[in-house]
């Protein structure tokens, strides 16, 4: 996998499963290393030997766990015994979750469009349980034009967010809004959050601005929220509730 040449991923974990097509038996490979790495899954071809797989990492040790199966299910069980189990998902998360950037990007009345979509799923007998709300809901005017600013609402698209959420709940739908974990430098709440000491400090590798690290976010440069701090997590939760 190469992020520069293929579709980007939100994260990658150096774990994979190899299945023998003949025996139908599997084995898991987990490389316990957080450094940047790449895998060659048998794509290499040389004239003197058969195709082979390889692993390369920029730093750290080759700390490899071979996880016995023979079934894929048993490998996953043992892999999660090693790394930790995920929290049990809510039942609704196992159902159909609607999602579309189209509705939140409409010039106006996105709220009505989403409600109409949910009503249509009911009419067509599609048992929808949730809706992933794309970030168009928080696209608002700033000093540098329209930007997606977490914890704001575009009131042309969502006229009364509280009422809209109530209507979705009434229809049995759990809404999962896209909440970006960074604050643009033009964000209207930036100074308030700075005063609450919610951002990562600058470093030797990132001079930043005003002593705070800066990265590239959707819409331009912004600050990194420091979720390692208990106080930041509490402030963040309160912003979600208030919004």
Name these PLM-found stretches.
Residues 1-93, 99-102, 110-112, 118-123:
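Catalytic and substrate-binding clefts that recognize carbohydrates or anionic sugar/phosphate headgroups
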Residues 87-243:
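Aromatic-lined carbohydrate-binding/catalytic grooves of carbohydrate-active enzymes
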């Amino acid at each position: 996998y190469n992020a520069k040449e293929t579709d980007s991923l939100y994260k990658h974990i150096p774990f994979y499963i190899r299945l023998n097509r003949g025996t139908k038996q599997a084995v898991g490979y987990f490389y316990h290393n957080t450094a940047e790495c790449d895998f060659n899954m048998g794509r290499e071809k040389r004239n003197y030997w058969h195709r082979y797989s390889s692993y390369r990492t920029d730093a750290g040790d080759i700390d490899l766990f071979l996880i016995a199966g023979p079934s894929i299910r048993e490998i996953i069980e043992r892999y999660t015994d090693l790394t930790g189990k995920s929290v049990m998902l809510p039942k609704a998360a196992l159902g159909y979750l609607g999602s579309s950037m189209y509705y939140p990007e409409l010039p106006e009345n996105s709220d009505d469009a989403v409600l109409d979509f949910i009503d249509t799923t009911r009419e067509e007998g599609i048992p929808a349980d949730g809706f992933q709300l794309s970030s168009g809901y928080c696209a608002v005017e700033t000093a540098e034009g329209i930007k997606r600013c977490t914890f704001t609402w575009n009131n042309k698209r969502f006229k009364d967010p509280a009422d809209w959420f109530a209507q979705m709940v009434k229809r049995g739908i759990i809404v999962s809004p896209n909440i970006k974990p960074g604050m643009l430098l033009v964000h209207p709440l930036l100074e308030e959050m700075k005063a609450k000491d919610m951002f990562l400090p600058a470093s030797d590798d990132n001079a930043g601005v005003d002593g705070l690290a800066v990265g590239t976010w959707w819409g331009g440069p912004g600050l990194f929220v420091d979720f390692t701090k208990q106080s930041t997590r509490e402030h963040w939760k309160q912003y979600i509730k208030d919004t």
